[in-house]
């Protein structure tokens, strides 16, 4: 195999950078690591909330001034750019959260790209089934195992937090399945149980923490149960180091998601050594199994309807979700999720054994360093192909 010299490579990495979204974190991690390896990286910063600290924002903006030669490949690392245009190769680095099927307009955009990069085989299978003509390659995401580890310290939590803590970290929205999780926790546990549920979440639209608190209260009241264990809401913006300390302050990570493109919170929690409870669907199914996690099976699949006014409907939250297949979780799923949480709470030896398997996998095979190396290998192949065309 020909040795790759990163200093001979250049790339325009386009997407959000300055928020705490998954794409923003991905772009920061890759841009910084590629640059440190010698790749000339120009950060094409798309508009987003500025949630990172001043130092990080300055580092990103410095990369936005990098000079790159004509014909440099552009990598759009986002759901989908409004315009796909470049004098060199055009690469879409994207992911979708549906279980089956992809939106027609989404696939049509794919066919405008020189290549499509996706983080898991779940997404590559969806593209293949949809008949996308552009070449598709796996370029994974990862975790910073130096930040997210079992020795990252423990965040102090409110006095209402009990000794045993379930944790869920994600944006607030129907796709993330907080309705399922909250109902399962409330119905399964009682005030006499030394347990609590910690929810670390913020609203995508910028609504205050009080909005999420009222949403949680509404879900709790819908169960009709009075004797219940406490729920603790953590909604302030945190750095990665603070987030790692939050993981380490808790005992089990739970994500009852209806669909993931990758799920950085799962791999970050696993890197910190937490047992994981999740859903058996979409991207997380490519690295979670019964040996390393507790998995909730869907009861079936249904089309996302943008006209569905239910709070749990994902159809109205993304243009590309319309009429695509997402898992169905109802009362049976709520009961089963509660059972899985109870199992991890009472049989801690089994939970620890599952966690050890997943932690080893994440910390050795699912790191940002590995993801960066794969990115460089693919970028080198694209650049070589471009040179051949010019000859």
Question: Where are the model-predicted features located?
Answer:
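Extended catalytic core of nucleotide-activated donor transferases of GT-like folds
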Residues: 2, 12, 49-130, 242
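Conserved donor-binding/catalytic core segment of Leloir-type glycosyltransferases
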Residues: 12, 158-176, 182-185, 197-199, ...
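Acidic anion/phosphate-binding donor-loop and adjacent secondary structure
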Residues: 104-105, 143-161
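Nucleotide-activated donor-binding/catalytic signature segment of Leloir-type glycosyltransferases, i.e.
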Residues: 209-237, 241
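Aromatic "clamp/platform" in nucleotide-sugar-dependent glycosyltransferases that forms part
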Residues: 258
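Short hydrophobic beta-strand element within catalytic cores of glycosyltransferases
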Residues: 266, 275-278, 288, 294-295
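A short, well-ordered alpha-helix in the C-terminal region of glycosyltransferases
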Residues: 336, 342-343, 350-364
């Amino acid at each position: 195999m020909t040795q790759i010299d990163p200093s001979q490579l250049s790339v325009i990495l386009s997407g959000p950078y300055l928020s705490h979204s998954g794409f923003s974190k991905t772009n920061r991690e890759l841009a910084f690591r590629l640059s440190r390896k010698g790749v000339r990286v120009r950060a094409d910063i798309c508009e987003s909330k500025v949630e990172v600290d001043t130092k990080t924002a300055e580092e990103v903006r410095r990369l936005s001034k990098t000079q790159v030669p004509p014909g440099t490949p552009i990598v759009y690392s986002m759901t989908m750019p409004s315009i796909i245009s470049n004098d060199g190769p055009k690469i879409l680095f994207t992911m979708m959260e549906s279980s089956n099927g992809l939106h027609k307009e989404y696939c049509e955009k794919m066919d405008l790209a020189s290549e499509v990069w996706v983080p898991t085989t779940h997404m590559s299978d969806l593209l293949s089934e949809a008949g996308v003509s552009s070449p598709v390659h796996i370029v994974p995401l990862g975790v910073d195992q130096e930040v997210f580890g079992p020795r990252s310290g423990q965040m102090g939590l409110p006095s209402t937090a009990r000794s045993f803590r379930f944790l869920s970290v994600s944006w607030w929205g129907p796709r993330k399945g907080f309705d399922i999780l909250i109902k399962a926790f409330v119905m399964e546990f009682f005030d006499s149980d030394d347990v609590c549920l910690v929810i670390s979440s913020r609203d995508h639209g910028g609504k205050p923490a009080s909005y999420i608190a009222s949403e949680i209260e509404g879900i709790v009241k819908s169960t009709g149960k009075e004797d219940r264990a406490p729920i603790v809401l953590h909604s302030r913006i945190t750095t990665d180091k603070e987030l790692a300390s939050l993981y380490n302050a808790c005992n089990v990570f739970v994500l009852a998601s209806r669909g993931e493109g990758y799920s950085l919170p799962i791999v970050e929690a696993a890197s910190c050594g937490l047992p994981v409870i999740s859903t058996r669907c979409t991207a997380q199914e490519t690295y979670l199994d019964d040996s390393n996690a507790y998995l909730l099976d869907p009861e079936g699949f249904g089309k996302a309807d943008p006209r569905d006014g239910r709070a749990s409907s994902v159809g109205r939250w993304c243009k590309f979700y319309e009429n695509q297949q997402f898992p169905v979780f109802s009362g049976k799923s709520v009961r089963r999720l509660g059972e899985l949480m109870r199992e991890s709470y009472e049989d801690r030896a089994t939970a620890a054994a599952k966690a050890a398997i997943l932690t080893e996998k994440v910390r050795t095979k699912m790191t940002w360093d590995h993801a960066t190396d794969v990115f460089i290998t693919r970028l080198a192949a694209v650049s070589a192909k471009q040179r051949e065309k010019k000859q």
